[in-house]
C-alpha cells in the first residue's frame, strides 16, 4: 500500500503533490460493493527480469459476505489468466474485464453467505511499463534487471477490497540468485534449480518466502541488487537497502529511521513488528511506498541532506495503515491523514515550532485545494483521484491538528495512544475514533467532527477592536506584583462568514510589556471579546500559531497554484494558466505564481512571454527563495535556445552567485556554464 510527498526537480514541487497530479482519470475502485472477503493468499511467483516477465500461481481463500454466484477480483491488465481451479482442482472459466482491471469467475455451485472456499489462479505476463497500470500513467508493477517492484496497489495478485480487506499470506518469489527480495513477514531463502519454463533464465535462482500471519496488507515485493546496511539500535531490526550510489548515505538514514520509529513508539505504543526495511525504489514510480515492515523511498528523494519528512510519513504508516486500517473509503483519512500529521509532529520535535508551522501551511493548502466534497463523503470520489488524496491526506491531517488544539496536548496524546492500542490489528471507523476522543475530552464533539468532516469550507477571520486606557496608570510602577492593575482594555469582535462555525481561537496581544494570549470561543458569524492588559497594546493577531484551518489569502493563492500544477501535469496547459493567473489576482507580486506562469509559456515555446514571467518572479516577493536561482537558470536556457550564448552564460553565473542549491540548482547552473542547453528533441 502506498500514497503521498517532497521535491521533484522537474516541476520543483512536493512529491506528494506530484503523486496526486499523476493519479487522475482513474477507474472508480470499489464502486461495486465488495461481496467477498479474502482471508489468505498462498502465492508462488517467478520473475524473469531480463524479459520483464512474471509467472504466478496464487491460491486465494475467501469468504462470501453474501450469496455469491460470481467471484470478482482486481488484477493488472498486463497479466493473462491461463487457468482457474476450484478447491477440488476442477477448472473454472474466467472473464477478463479490462475496463476496470478485473477478473470475474462464475461459481457453478454458488457460494452461500459466510461460506469459505479457495480458488487457484495461474497467470503470467510482461510488466515493463505503466501503459496498462491499474492507475493510468503510474507504474505500480514492473519487472526489470536492476530493480523489480510489485506494489499491492499494482494488483499483481487477485485483489478484493483494496486497502480495506485485511489478509494473511505466504508469498514465495523466485529470482536470479544475485538478487535480493524484500517483502513483509518472516523471511526464508533457498537455492533453487534453474527454471525449465520456456524463455526462463538458465542461471541459478533463489527463492525468498515471506510468511505474514497477522492480517494486514502484505503483498508489496521489491527485488534487485542492493547494498544492505543493518542496525539493531533501540531494539529495532532495521535493514536499509540502497543502491551502491547511495550506500554512503545509509548510516544517516538509519539513524533517522531509528529516531522516527522510537518517537512514534512514545506516541502510539509498539507497532505490529520491530522490523523495518527501508528500501530504495526507482525514480519512475511512487515518491514513497509502505507495507508491513517496509518503507520505500524513490531514489531521487534520497539526498545527502536526509529526507526525514518523507521517511517519517512512510514509517508512520506502520501504525496508521498496517496496524490500524480504515473500515471504509470514508475512513481513509484515518490512515493517510494520521500518517501525514504524525510526520508533522515529528517535524515539530526535530525542527521546533517553526518546522511545524511550515508543515501546517502545506497541509492547509492541500486541505482546501479541492474542498468541494465533505471528507465524510470521500467514497464518492476515486481513491486515486487528486481530490480524494488531497482530502484524505491533508484535510485529515488538519483535523488532527485542530483536535489537538481543542483537546489540549495531554488529552490529545492519550486519545491517539488509546486509539492505536484498542484498534491494533483491526479496521476502525471515524465513529470509533470520535468515541475515544469524546471520552478523553469529557464532552461530546459532534460540533467539531460535523464541522470539519461533514461540511466543506473554512473561515476567513476578520478583526475589529478598540483600545481603552483604564483608570490605573500603566506607567506607574506598583509597589508589588499583587498591586498591579490592568492599564488597558481591548474590546472588539471576530467575524467570519460561516453561520454554523464554532471553534476556540487564540488572540495574541503584543504590548509594551508582556505578550497576552486569550482563548476566544468563536461561535457563528460574530464573536465579541474583551481583554485587559497591563501594557499598551501594539498589535493583535488572530490564531498566530495556525491552530485552525482558515481560508486566508495566502492559502487561496497557494491552493490555486496547486490546482494549476495538477492541471499542468495532466497536460491541460490552458486550464493550468488560468489557475496561475487566479493566484496572481490574489497577489500580483507572487514570485511562485509568476514562476509557474513562466513554466507554462516555456512548455508552449512562447519564450518571450516566458522570459518576462521569469523576470517578474525574480523581482517579486521572493517566496519561496528558490524561485530566484531557478528563474536565472531558466532564463539561461531561453537565451541558449534563441542563440544568445553570452546572455545565457550571464544568467547561469548569476544563478551560481545566489549560493542557493535547492533541488541541485548550482550543479544545474554549472553544467550549462560548461555546455549550452539544448532543447530536447520531440519524440516521434
Identify the role of each PLM range.
Residues 78-139, 195-203, 207, 524-536:
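A surface-exposed beta-strand-loop module
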Residues 66, 272, 382, 389-486, ...:
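Amphipathic alpha-helical substructures
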Residues 142-143, 171, 209, 226-332, ...:
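Juxtacatalytic substrate-recognition/specificity segment
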Residues 81-85, 182, 445-446, 459-542:
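Beta-strand-rich binding/interaction modules
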Residues 213, 287, 330-332, 336-402, ...:
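Acidic/His/Gly-enriched intrinsically disordered linker/tail segments
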Residues 122-226:
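Extended, low-hydrophobicity, Ser/Thr/Pro/Gly-biased non-transmembrane segments
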Residues 24-55, 63, 82, 139-143, ...:
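N-terminal, polar/Ser/Thr-rich
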Amino acid at each position: 500500500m502506498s500514497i503521498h510527498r517532497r521535491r521533484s526537480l522537474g516541476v520543483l514541487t512536493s512529491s506528494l503533490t506530484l503523486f496526486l497530479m499523476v493519479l487522475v482519470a482513474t477507474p472508480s475502485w470499489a464502486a461495486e460493493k465488495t461481496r467477498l472477503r479474502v482471508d489468505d493468499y498462498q502465492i508462488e511467483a517467478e520473475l524473469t527480469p531480463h524479459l520483464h516477465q512474471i509467472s504466478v500461481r496464487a491460491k486465494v481463500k475467501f469468504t462470501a459476505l453474501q450469496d455469491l454466484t460470481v467471484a470478482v477480483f482486481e488484477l493488472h491488465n498486463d497479466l493473462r489468466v491461463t487457468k482457474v481451479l476450484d478447491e477440488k482442482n476442477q477448472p473454472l472459466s474466467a472473464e477478463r474485464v479490462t475496463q476496470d482491471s478485473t477478473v470475474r469467475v462464475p461459481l457453478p455451485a454458488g457460494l452461500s453467505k459466510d461460506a469459505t472456499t479457495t480458488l487457484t489462479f495461474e497467470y503470467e505476463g510482461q510488466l515493463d511499463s505503466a501503459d496498462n497500470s491499474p492507475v493510468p500513467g503510474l507504474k505500480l508493477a514492473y519487472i526489470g534487471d536492476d530493480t523489480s517492484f510489485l506494489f499491492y496497489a499494482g494488483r499483481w495478485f487477485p485483489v478484493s477490497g483494496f486497502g480495506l480487506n485485511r489478509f494473511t499470506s505466504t508469498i514465495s518469489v523466485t529470482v536470479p540468485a544475485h538478487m535480493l527480495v524484500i517483502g513483509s513477514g518472516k523471511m526464508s531463502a533457498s537455492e533453487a534449480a534453474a527454471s525449465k519454463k520456456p524463455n526462463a533464465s538458465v542461471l541459478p535462482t533463489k527463492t525468498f518466502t515471506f510468511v505474514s500471519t497477522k492480517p494486514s496488507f502484505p503483498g508489496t515485493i521489491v527485488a534487485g541488487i542492493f547494498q544492505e546496511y543493518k542496525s539493531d539500535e533501540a531494539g529495532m531490526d532495521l535493514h536499509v537497502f540502497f543502491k551502491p550510489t547511495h550506500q554512503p548515505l545509509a548510516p544517516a538514514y538509519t539513524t533517522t529511521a531509528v529516531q522516527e520509529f522510537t518517537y512514534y513508539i512514545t506516541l502510539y505504543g509498539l507497532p505490529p513488528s520491530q522490523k523495518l526495511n527501508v528500501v530504495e525504489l526507482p525514480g519512475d514510480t511512487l515518491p514513497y511506498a509502505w507495507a508491513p515492515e517496509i518503507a520505500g523511498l524513490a531514489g531521487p528523494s534520497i539526498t545527502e541532506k536526509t529526507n526525514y519528512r518523507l521517511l517519517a510519513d512512510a514509517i508512520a504508516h506502520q501504525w496508521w495503515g498496517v496496524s490500524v486500517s480504515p473500515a471504509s473509503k470514508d475512513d481513509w483519512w484515518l490512515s493517510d491523514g494520521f500518517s501525514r500529521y504524525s510526520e508533522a509532529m515529528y517535524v515539530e520535535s526535530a525542527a521546533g515550532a517553526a518546522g511545524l508551522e511550515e508543515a501546517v501551511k502545506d497541509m492547509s493548502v492541500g486541505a482546501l485545494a479541492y474542498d468541494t466534497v465533505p471528507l465524510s463523503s470521500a467514497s464518492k470520489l476515486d481513491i486515486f483521484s487528486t481530490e480524494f488524496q488531497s482530502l484524505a491526506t491533508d484535510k485529515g491531517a488538519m483535523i488532527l491538528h485542530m483536535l489537538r488544539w481543542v483537546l489540549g496536548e495531554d488529552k490529545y496524546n492519550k486519545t491517539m495512544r488509546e486509539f492505536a492500542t484498542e484498534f491494533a490489528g483491526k479496521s476502525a471507523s471515524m465513529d470509533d475514533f470520535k468515541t475515544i476522543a469524546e471520552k478523553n475530552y469529557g464532552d461530546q464533539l459532534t460540533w467539531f467532527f460535523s464541522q470539519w468532516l461533514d461540511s466543506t469550507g473554512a473561515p476567513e477571520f476578520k478583526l475589529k477592536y478598540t483600545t481603552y486606557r483604564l483608570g490605573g496608570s500603566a506607567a506607574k510602577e506598583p509597589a508589588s506584583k499583587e498591586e498591579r492593575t490592568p492599564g488597558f482594555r481591548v474590546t472588539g469582535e471576530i467575524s467570519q462568514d460561516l453561520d454554523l462555525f464554532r471553534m476556540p481561537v487564540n488572540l495574541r496581544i503584543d504590548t509594551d510589556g508582556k505578550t497576552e494570549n486569550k482563548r476566544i470561543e468563536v461561535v457563528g458569524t460574530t464573536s465579541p471579546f474583551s481583554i485587559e492588559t497591563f501594557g499598551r497594546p501594539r498589535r493583535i493577531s488572530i490564531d498566530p500559531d495556525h491552530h485552525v484551518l482558515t481560508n486566508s489569502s495566502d492559502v487561496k493563492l497557494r491552493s490555486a497554484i496547486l490546482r494549476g500544477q495538477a492541471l499542468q501535469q495532466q497536460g491541460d496547459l490552458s486550464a493550468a494558466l488560468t489557475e496561475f493567473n487566479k493566484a496572481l489576482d490574489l497577489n500580483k507580486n507572487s514570485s511562485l505564481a509568476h514562476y509557474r506562469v513562466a513554466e507554462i509559456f516555456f512548455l508552449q515555446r512562447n519564450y518571450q512571454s516566458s522570459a518576462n514571467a521569469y523576470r517578474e518572479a525574480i523581482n517579486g516577493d521572493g517566496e519561496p527563495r528558490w524561485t530566484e536561482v531557478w528563474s536565472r537558470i531558466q532564463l539561461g536556457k531561453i537565451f541558449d535556445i534563441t542563440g544568445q550564448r553570452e546572455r545565457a552564460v550571464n544568467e547561469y553565473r548569476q544563478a551560481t552567485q545566489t549560493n542557493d542549491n535547492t533541488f541541485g540548482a548550482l550543479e544545474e547552473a554549472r553544467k550549462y556554464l560548461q555546455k549550452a542547453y539544448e532543447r530536447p528533441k520531440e519524440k516521434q
